Curated annotation (Swiss-Prot):
It is found in: Cytoplasm. Belongs to the phosphoenolpyruvate carboxykinase (ATP) family. This is Phosphoenolpyruvate carboxykinase (ATP). GO terms for molecular function: ATP binding; metal ion binding; phosphoenolpyruvate carboxykinase (ATP) activity. It comes from Ruegeria sp. (strain TM1040) (Silicibacter sp.). Pathway: Carbohydrate biosynthesis; gluconeogenesis. Keywords: ATP-binding, Cytoplasm, Decarboxylase, Gluconeogenesis, Lyase, Manganese, Metal-binding, Nucleotide-binding. It catalyses: oxaloacetate + ATP = phosphoenolpyruvate + ADP + CO2. The keyword Acetylation does not apply.
Length: 532
């Protein structure tokens, strides 16, 4: 039996997927919540939020992501970063997954990736779990109902958590698999209930397709000044560095919190929703995000709650530190209706420095911006990937290496060209530790970070006095309104100055060692900006 609204000429049977149980096409939020509840997939929380747990997988499994190596992509995929799968392995995986699906109920959402209609792609998401369908309906962009009648997908994603891959038969690493086949325009996900795999699969897809059109795909959040979309800012950063929190500024209009493109006519969100971390979420510091946790249909992932009152435990990380909520963009009161902005006037690169040696903000030259973009220094925040239980310093190129199918210099050169063409001012912002490394220091005060960003975005920080950092070479403001001067000089925040010097020297060497891999691909300006 099938139900819901769908193009009558583009059902799953028309794609060769037959023998399923009930198939539900493009159900809206109330129906999806009802289906998920009736199937025992979770609980109804306050305000109608849907509370779920994802079992042993509470973060992404980047080592289980594979790209099918065919002639059309063999020379363009960054194979050092993307595990390959043979076409034969994928064919066997697809056949076995479709066989496994027979007789089972499935949910289908026909959605759009990209707020700019010129560059958008149509995505069909087929999920075994009703709440996964609800999740992706929030996170991607929802076409008008009448447009579903002639919707044809450019790519199809099938997510079947109950299916387990056979590494020998399917040419993959483990029983968990995420397999992208650009020739067959299909992504298969199996063996994990973690919902983030759904959205990041679409992101990886766009990160491959858009550079061919001269569009810079970015792992960033974005906002713009009220009444002035030309005054756009983007915030690069790995998961947990503050993209969602810092872009949700009540004094600016939110474009999006995680994935964007920079085209010839400005920036645009890839998504239609947000996926925010909720650990220690504070209603005073982040009122807009906090409010979404009690709105109808918001997916609350891996949070504990009081069994009688259903009050959420925001400080309980017993399931994972990577607890999250997923909600549509319009749940944020100051979100942009178009999800589009101008060319970035300011580019902020967020780093979570677990060493505690970087300043809270630094101004970068275009060459330094290219250097830090390719370096992508940050810390993996607890829970965002399997096995990460405390901050781990890492270099994740483009501030999103797990999602980059092409070589880093492809994205780096696009960024350099865009900065040169539009004159963006670039900043490095440390949301990590101050006064010591992780374990001895403290987390950078969010009020100080917000004050510095406000000054950067309104242009007043450009008029401040700057000093050149002796270790890293960038310019650091000496003073800024609302921020203690001592905080702007990280060495002064350490009790043991010799320990700071040793830690800074260690990080400088790590930067230098990591960047050697990019030296053959960069120009002399960027080489001169390198930290060594």
């Amino acid at each position: 039996m099938t139900s819901g609204r769908v193009n009558p000429n583009f059902r799953l049977e028309d794609q060769g997927i037959e023998g399923l149980g009930n198939v539900y096409y493009n159900l809206m939020e109330p129906a999806l919540v009802q289906e998920a509840l009736s199937r025992g997939e979770g609980n109804l929380g306050k305000g109608g939020a849907f509370l779920v747990t994802t079992g042993k997988f509470t973060g992404r499994s980047p080592k289980d992501k594979h790209v099918v190596k065919t002639a059309s992509v063999a020379d363009t995929i960054w194979w050092e970063n993307n595990a390959e799968m043979s076409p034969e392995g994928f064919d066997a995986l697809y056949a076995d997954m479709v066989e496994h699906m027979k007789g089972r109920d499935y949910f289908v959402q026909d959605l759009v990736g990209g707020a700019d209609p010129v560059h958008a792609i149509n995505v069909r998401m087929v999920t075994e779990l009703a709440w996964h369908n609800l999740f992706i309906r929030h996170l991607l962009r929802r076409p008008d109902r009448e447009d579903l009648d002639d919707f044809i997908a450019d790519f199809t994603i099938i997510n079947c958590p109950s299916f387990q891959a056979d590494p020998n038969k399917h040419n993959c690493r483990s029983e968990t698999v995420i397999a992208l086949n650009f020739d067959r325009k299909m992504i298969l996900i199996g063996g994990t209930e973690y919902a983030g795999e759904n959205k990041k699969s679409v992101f990886t897809l766009l990160n491959y397709l858009l550079p061919e059109k001269g569009i810079m795909p970015m792992h960033c959040s974005a906002n713009h000044a009220k009444g002035n979309p030309v005054d756009t800012a983007v915030f690069f950063g790995l998961s947990g560095t503050g993209k969602t929190t810092l872009s949700a500024d009540p004094d600016r209009v939110l474009i999006g919190d995680d994935e964007h493109g920079w085209a010839s006519n400005g920036t645009f969100n890839f998504e239609g929703g947000c996926y925010a971390k909720t650990i220690n979420l504070n209603p005073e510091a982040e009122p807009e995000i906090y409010a979404t946790t009690e709105k109808f249909g918001t997916v609350i992932e891996n949070m504990t709650f009081d069994p009688e009152t259903f009050d959420l435990n925001f400080d309980d990380d017993s399931l994972t530190a990577n607890m999250r909520c997923a909600y549509p963009l319009h749940y944020i009161s100051n979100a942009s209706a178009s999800a589009r902005g101008g060319h970035p006037k300011n580019i902020i690169m967020l780093t979570c420095d677990a060493f505690g040696v970087l300043p809270p903000i630094a101004r970068l030259t275009p060459a330094q911006a290219m250097y830090h973009f390719l370096s992508g220094f940050t810390s993996k925040v607890a829970g965002t990937e399997r096995g990460v239980t405390e901050p781990e310093p890492t270099f994740s190129t483009c501030f999103g290496a797990p999602f980059m199918p092409r070589r880093p210099e492809v994205y780096g050169n696009l960024l350099r060209e865009k900065i040169a063409a539009h004159g963006a001012t670039c900043w490095l912002v440390n949301t990590g530790w101050t006064g010591g490394a992780y374990g001895t220091g403290s987390r950078m005060p969010i009020k100080a970070t917000r004050a510095l960003l406000t000054a950067a975005l309104d242009g007043s920080l450009a008029n401040a006095e700057f000093r050149k950092d002796p270790n890293f070479g960038f310019d650091v403001p000496v003073a800024a309104p609302g921020v203690a001067e001592v905080l702007l000089d990280p060495r002064r925040t350490w009790d043991d100055k010799a320990a700071y010097d040793a830690q800074a020297e260690k990080l400088v060497q790590m930067f230098s060692d990591n960047f050697e891999q990019y030296l053959p691909y960069i120009d002399e300006d960027v080489k001169a900006a390198a930290i060594c």
